[in-house]
């Protein structure tokens, strides 16, 4: 688990400092491969005991391996794609280093969201992944690219603010049972005692969480950022948005869906999620 987080963040710092764009592209691929292999090892090594910040279970291990695999394959395509953008003059060598460094920070944010056992830390990780992709969508610095990046940033900020409010409401629902402190933010502890939480407050919290993280998933009506972000950003980032970032937000929703399912008096979020998915 430590390697899945340390490799991307340490690689990002190194990528930002390296001078040669060819070397940065190769290091990005090597770092992505190492992260993927570390994720695969989670299937065979003994899983760590759930702590206040880190959790590995049957749900997130699939997401982690999928995330690192797509991240690795996309980094291979990125190497040639971004080099071509340098040759055509659309990007400078400085922006190439910036791209590869942001790529690894993005991978760190998404991996952190998947392994987090703290709903507050998970929110921070999703926000980090969002901000890095915003910067990468606008990397061409054209009017259309900057407009797409700003639209993505504004709608994403609205969504993440709603998700933050929903997270706070979950903590408020848990506080009478869990007491003060971080126990009210630890997902495994929340699920164990969710049956005793205020169901009405949990229901309201899920509405905000659904709207907030649903914006990241691309659910209607807050999906307007998707077409422009795909069209104006680099092609590898379009693949990352579809194959990875949307999954991170969906994973967060699934965690809260499980939490509500542990409270028999709360709403059943499944039909709502299916309906909005079909509408979108």
Task: State what each model feature region is.
Residues 32-47, 106-108, 160, 245-249:
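A generic, lipid-embedded transmembrane alpha helix
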Residues 11-24, 73-89, 134-148, 217-231, ...:
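C-terminal ends of transmembrane helices
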Residues 23-35, 90-104, 147-159, 230-242:
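Cytoplasmic-side transmembrane-helix entry/capping segments in multi-pass membrane proteins
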Residues 12-17, 40, 108-112, 135-136, ...:
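Alpha-helical transmembrane segments of multipass membrane proteins
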Residues 45-53, 86-92, 162-223, 228, ...:
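Juxtamembrane/interfacial segments at transmembrane-helix boundaries in multi-pass membrane proteins
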Residues 2-101, 181, 188:
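Transmembrane helix-loop-helix hairpins at membrane boundaries of multipass inner-membrane proteins
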